[in-house]
Regions:
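Immediate flanking context of iron-sulfur cluster ligation sites
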Residues: 37-54, 75-84
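Iron-sulfur (Fe-S) cluster-binding segments and ferredoxin-like electron-carrier domains
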Residues: 62-77, 103
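C-terminal structural segments of small proteins and small subunits
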Residues: 78-104
Length: 108
């Protein structure tokens, strides 16, 4: 089972058991993740950078997908990861690598 399938299963279980929280969080994300003064692409890169530095695997899957869907290239994602490594040190390299693997799959 790949990372996206695992995340989908976990999200389904969360929605079934916490529908109110899920709905409110979804509304929040719908408000935040759209073009504004920052483009959706920029917001997804920021979210992925945060996901990598806080080591949230599900967030990494979600926002790597978001980056690709928003039009990010592998080069843009990789450059953002340079900042993650500069700010997060060695652990950021592990989680950045996970995101690169996912992005590589999605960009094929």
């Amino acid at each position: 089972m790949d990372s996206k399938e695992v995340l989908a299963q976990q999200s389904k279980l969360f929605r079934e058991n916490l529908p109110g929280v899920t709905e409110n969080f979804s509304d929040l994300c719908g408000t935040v993740f759209k073009d504004g003064k920052l483009s959706l692409k920029e917001k997804e890169l920021i979210a992925l950078a945060i996901a990598i530095t806080v080591k949230c695997e599900g967030c990494i899957v979600h926002h790597t997908t978001g980056c690709v869907e928003a039009g990010c290239t592998m080069e843009e994602i990789s450059e953002m990861m340079e900042v993650c490594v500069a700010m997060g040190g060695g652990p950021a390299t592990v989680y950045a690598g996970k995101s690169l693997r996912i992005a590589e799959e999605l960009l094929k």
